[in-house]
């Protein structure tokens, strides 16, 4: 870790009272209470205006409540303070030649709503999808159980009705059963028997 970066971390932790949270690429991360602070590092021997503002744009796209750009004194010639202030971006100048006293916050960053990180969005989507899937399954199971119980109840009612009819038939007196059976015989049955007797008597 080079000396300007060490001075920068020391200033943010010991002077500004933030907690160092790590480094990702050319960005140092700090924690200020519940807020995340990103400090972009742009230390070079030869500064380019286009590259400087490109880095500022990249910092504004990070999921941080505050963002700073840290540069060496030579970069001040390309800095437009109005642009930094209008966008709420802080500016930190690090002069290694001055040692621990060589870090100065020229422009303080303005707190802004932190962008929601894509990973957090994906996590929320996954949790919501899982919840909806479980609820849908629960509703389907409940509906299926209600339909099953309804069908079983109707089947039992039909069975009981048929059983009652059979029991009524078995409990009926013999005369009624015979009458019921004779009522089912063809009407021409008795007449046919009489004709058979007449024909036999004439033989």
UniProtKB/Swiss-Prot annotation:
It is found in: Cytoplasm, Cytoskeleton. Keywords: Cytoplasm, Cytoskeleton. GO terms for cellular component: cytoplasm; cytoskeleton. It comes from the Archaea. Belongs to a conserved five-gene operon within Thermoproteales denoted Arcade (actin-related cytoskeleton in Archaea involved in shape determination). Interacts with crenactin. The C-terminal helix is essential for activity. Part of an actin-like archaeal cytoskeleton. Prevents polymerization of crenactin filaments by binding its C-terminus into crenactin's hydrophobic groove. May act by competing with the D-loop of the following crenactin subunit for the hydrophobic groove. This is Arcadin-2. It comes from Pyrobaculum calidifontis (strain DSM 21063 / JCM 11548 / VA1). The lineage of its organism: Archaea, Thermoproteota, Thermoprotei, Thermoproteales, Thermoproteaceae. The gene is rkd-2.
